[in-house]
Amino acid sequence: MSENTFPVYKVDVIVQFYRTEVLTGQESKHFTKNDLTPTPKPESVQRLYMRILQLLFRFRPECHYTVPLSENIQYPMLYESFAPIMSVYMRMCQFLPVCRVYDFSLSDLLNPKTKRTITILSAIQNFLHFRKQRLEITAAHQQSFRADMDRLQAYTREIKEAEKKIEKLTTIPPEQQAEAKELASALAELSTNTQHEYQDVSAINEKVAQFKTEIAELSQKLTQRKVEVATLKDEISKLKSQIVESPEELKNEMERMRETAKNIKMSKELADERLVELQMLVQCASQVEAEIQILLKQLQDLQSSMSKTKQRKEEVQSLEVMNESLQKELKSLSSEEAQLKRALTMKLDKESKQQIRRQKKKEVKDQQVKNIYGQYDKMHQKRQEIVKKIEECNRETKQFKEKMQALRENCNQRTQKAQEIYERLLTTLEQYHKRIEKILVETNADALKMKSHF
């Protein structure tokens, strides 16, 4: 275990694994623990290696016995006995490095040792476990890939159907293209008008904001003037109490004060008028906004009514088409009814005439049928005679085939005997040649001895 990179299993585990996973049928039944311990049997080990190669590489056992040489070779039996062992050895040398076994030799096939065979078989078992796990994982990946492909195909189909539906919904039929163009132009005009009105409303709102700022400034100025007037009145009352002036100066001061009061009143009146104008403008702006909102609502109602009228027009057109088709069908049905009535009267006349003709034809046919039955009886008798002849021919052919089969079997037996005789002759000739060679060698040796003796 310290040298190997794989676990060495027990003999019972190895036997059970190879019986269930590698071998099949009678081979799995006959493969036991005695084939590996105490001394492994070379035939069973070689057969097991062949089955492993068949499982992994689809290399059947009969393929090992094919001799890759020309037909005209001397003693092909020697090659036939040696070819499968060398083929298994070459294939195992190529395969076992994958299982982390690098020192496989011919002695492991011809004269296997227990410890060595157990390590090799446990290495192969470890690789087969790994292979099984990888196959399960790849099968799971393939199933998931197939499911994903099915989903993708379903999604592509749904996408194509959705695209077709979108095309149907977006494309306007030629009958409604003129109406659609008119509606589009009307909508464009409405949108331009609404934009202009929105611009006017925004301009009015800006003016209203300016007026509001002006009103605020004027109100501030008014408050300041009122404060100034109050301060001036206080100062005047103080000055009156402190200073006693001349009547002329008082008159002048009073006139000045009156002029200033008049000016203040005039400015106040102007400010009030301006305020009233601005309030009127604000009211007008609010009225304009309300009117614009009403217009927008009317436009929306108009669009909804246009769509409803369009739907109703389509329904009316479809109903008109249905009405026309029904009227046409009614006309065709009425004409067909008249034609059928005429045809019925004609048919009744024809049937009465045909009934008489049929009766006459029936009498003629009955006579013909009687004649045909007589001919059929004669033909049936002839047919039975022919069937008997065919059965006799079939019996003769069957007997002939049986004779042919017996002759073929006899020929095969004779050819087998001839082949056996030929093989015996070959073996005897080989033995005879060997004996002659031995005799020649012995005679040569005797001659040499005689020469040396003389």
UniProtKB/Swiss-Prot annotation:
It holds the Pfam family Nuf2. Keywords: Cell cycle, Cell division, Centromere, Chromosome, Coiled coil, Kinetochore, Mitosis, Nucleus. One of its GO terms (cellular component) is Ndc80 complex. One of its GO terms (biological process) is meiotic chromosome segregation. It is found in: Nucleus; Chromosome, Centromere, Kinetochore. The keyword Ubl conjugation does not apply. Residues 143-347, 375-439 form a coiled coil. GO terms for molecular function: microtubule binding; protein-containing complex binding. Component of the NDC80 complex, which is composed of ndc80, cdca1, spbc24 and spbc25. Acts as a component of the essential kinetochore-associated NDC80 complex, which is required for chromosome segregation and spindle checkpoint activity. Belongs to the NUF2 family. This is Kinetochore protein Nuf2. It comes from Danio rerio. The lineage of its organism: Eukaryota, Metazoa, Chordata, Craniata, Vertebrata. The gene is nuf2.
